[in-house]
Regions:
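Substrate-binding/active-site clefts of carbohydrate-active enzymes
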Residues: 1-163
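Conserved alpha/beta catalytic core and glycan-binding cleft of carbohydrate-active enzymes
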Residues: 129-131, 146-265
């Protein structure tokens, strides 16, 4: 019922959240337990495939919101103690748990993790015919601090040795594999620090994402409508926020997402 309306209004792409199975509905699908399973809350795998096929028939691409930045802590239905080894996929010690998300952090330096996550990308592309991915929480992957409590004001803040080289390697490999499986696939990075080169081509020294999200725009928009009367809106400031991007990176600009509508950021 929704797809015809989307097509009629001229949209050619949709993003679907909470696809991967997750035990807690309130996590919005971001505490993933079964990375290769379509969430049973919303229907069967065949029904998801039918939805994607129907969208394609209407000329609508379908992007999956994929979560490779962390995993749920649950051990019964998750990877937290898979095969009796709590560290098979995750960092040991103090780096094991994410300090803000109550979840586990993948150790991207392990071959098992790289193979697991790369095959996960390939699986959703081939089995369900998704047209690409929006990678969630990329900032958390890039930095040992997860980007928490840090200000990124100049290029020195991006290249000071606090970056997780293994995670950067994984993201680059993921983009390479995804575009080998489907050269027309779209990859989008949700990233708040402004890491240079994220959406630049791999051959140019970038990470290979097709787009990065302009996350400054919704923050600016929410602040404006909440704190300023209409007469105080400055067109020059609005123009600068919308056009503030690097020339070598394509950017997806937007005014609102689930972060604003549901989470309340």
């Amino acid at each position: 019922k929704i797809l015809p309306r989307i097509a009629e209004e001229g949209y050619n792409c949709i993003q679907i959240m909470a696809i991967q199975e997750h035990p807690y509905y309130g996590s919005f699908g971001y505490h993933v337990s079964s990375f290769f399973a379509a969430s049973s809350r919303f229907g069967t795998p065949d029904e998801l495939k039918a939805l994607i096929d129907a969208a394609h028939e209407m000329g609508i691409a379908v992007i999956m919101d994929i979560v490779h930045s962390h995993a749920v802590k649950n051990e019964v239905e998750g990877l937290g103690n898979f095969a009796g080894d709590p560290n098979q996929y995750f960092y040991p010690g103090v780096r094991r748990e994410h300090p803000a998300w109550d979840s586990l952090c993948f150790d991207y330096g392990k071959n098992e993790v790289i193979h697991f996550l790369l095959s996960n990308c390939k699986y959703w592309l081939e089995e369900y015919k998704f047209d690409g991915f929006r990678f969630d929480g990329v900032t958390s992957m890039l930095y040992y601090s997860h980007g928490l409590g840090e200000a990124f004001c100049n290029y020195g803040d991006y290249f000071n040795g606090h970056q997780d080289d293994n995670a950067i390697c994984y993201l680059t490999l993921a983009n390479e594999v995804i575009h080998q499986v489907n050269p027309k696939a779209i990859t989008i990075a949700e990233e708040v620090s402004g890491m240079p080169g994220l959406a630049a081509k791999i051959e140019d020294g970038g990470y290979g994402f097709d787009y990065r999200m302009a996350m400054n725009i919704p923050d600016y928009w929410i602040k404006t409508i909440k704190e300023k009367i209409d007469e105080d809106w400055k067109p020059s400031s609005m123009f600068w926020e919308v056009t503030n991007r690097r020339q070598d990176e394509k950017t997806i600009s937007y005014a609102e997402s689930h972060d604003q509508a549901l989470v309340g950021d």
